[in-house]
């Protein structure tokens, strides 16, 4: 990004070369370069976690592309992203549990993205998803199929996968992923987590001590927007 911006600055400077001395052009180049970097930095929200209006939130990004995460009132949040590497963010609870979750809103990915109940446990270290909608890529296609579970008016396919030396809540680690992927996409409704936890357990997919649990938007090498409210 830096080399591209400097090239753009140089091109801009060349246009006015006949009308300005060299010192003035250098000053203008530095000002434009620094201003552009500042504007780029303002467009990207840094990774963070915490509490917002009674709900726990988590936002993580690998720093690629531009992504803006905004906490709204109560359980609402929004995300705008463009040409990202990878990010995941949303609102919910800490710790997670076998609760019944209600949510609604809009989810508009252009490319690869997920709208899911997303959480972690430790001992064992597990990253889990109950995917309600997704973009161009079905996340379950990269895992091992285990079966189905019927819940909340829909059918979910169950998968498991292993991530090696990947980012986690305890740092870079190797861990297991559990997935329930809804066969009919939706962007609002009820998710009965107990149904998924019980179905996973029936396939030997056991959870540990719950960490956070959020209704998350995730984007991977894509662009898009979402606005979600958790109840």
UniProtKB/Swiss-Prot annotation:
- According to its UniProt record, what is one Pfam family this protein matches? Glyco_hydro_11
The UniProt entry, under InterPro entries, shows:
ConA-like_dom_sf, GH11/12, GH11_AS_1, GH11_AS_2, GH11_dom, Glyco_hydro_11
Enzyme class per UniProt: hydrolase
At the top level of its lineage, which domain of life is listed?
Eukaryota
**Annotated GH11 domain residues:** 43-231
Subcellular localization, as worded in the UniProt entry: Secreted
Write down the EC number.
Answer: 3.2.1.8
Q: Where is the active site?
A: 127 (nucleophile), 218 (proton donor)
Question: Which residues are modified by glycosylation?
Answer: 34
GO BP annotations, alphabetical order: xylan catabolic process
Q: Could you give one GO CC term from the UniProt record?
A: extracellular region
Q: Predominant location of this chain?
A: secreted
Keywords of the record: Carbohydrate metabolism, Glycoprotein, Glycosidase, Hydrolase, Polysaccharide degradation, Secreted, Signal, Xylan degradation
Report the GO molecular function annotations.
endo-1,4-beta-xylanase activity
Q: In which pathway does it act?
A: Glycan degradation; xylan degradation
- What are the boundaries of the signal sequence? 1-19
- Reactions catalysed according to its record: Endohydrolysis of (1->4)-beta-D-xylosidic linkages in xylans
Q: What does this protein do?
A: Endo-1,4-beta-xylanase involved in the hydrolysis of xylan, a major structural heterogeneous polysaccharide found in plant biomass representing the second most abundant polysaccharide in the biosphere, after cellulose.
Q: What does the similarity note say?
A: Belongs to the glycosyl hydrolase 11 (cellulase G) family.
Q: What is this protein called?
A: Probable endo-1,4-beta-xylanase A
Q: What is the species listed in this Swiss-Prot or TrEMBL entry?
A: Aspergillus terreus (strain NIH 2624 / FGSC A1156)
């Amino acid at each position: 990004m830096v080399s591209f911006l400097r090239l753009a600055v140089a091109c801009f400077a060349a246009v006015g070369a006949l009308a300005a001395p060299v010192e003035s052009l250098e000053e203008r180049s530095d000002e434009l370069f620094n201003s552009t970097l500042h504007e780029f930095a303002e467009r990207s929200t840094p990774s963070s976690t915490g509490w917002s209006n009674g709900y726990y939130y988590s936002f993580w990004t690998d720093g690629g592309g531009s992504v803006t995460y905004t906490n709204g009132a109560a359980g609402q949040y929004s995300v705008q992203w463009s040409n990202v590497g990878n990010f995941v963010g949303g609102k919910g609870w800490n710790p997670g549990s076998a609760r019944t979750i209600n949510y609604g809103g809009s989810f508009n990915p252009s490319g690869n993205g997920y709208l899911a109940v997303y959480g972690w446990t430790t001992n064992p270290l597990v990253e889990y998803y109950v995917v309600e909608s997704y973009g161009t890529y079905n996340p379950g296609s990269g895992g091992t199929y285990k079966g189905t579970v019927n819940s909340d008016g829909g059918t979910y396919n169950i998968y498991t996968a292993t991530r090696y030396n990947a980012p986690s809540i305890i740092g870079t680690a190797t861990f297991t992923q559990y997935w329930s992927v809804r066969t009919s996409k939706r962007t609002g409704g009820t998710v009965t987590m107990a149904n998924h936890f019980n179905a996973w357990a029936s396939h030997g997919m056991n959870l540990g001590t719950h960490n956070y649990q959020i209704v998350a938007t995730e984007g991977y090498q894509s662009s898009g927007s979402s606005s979600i409210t958790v109840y």
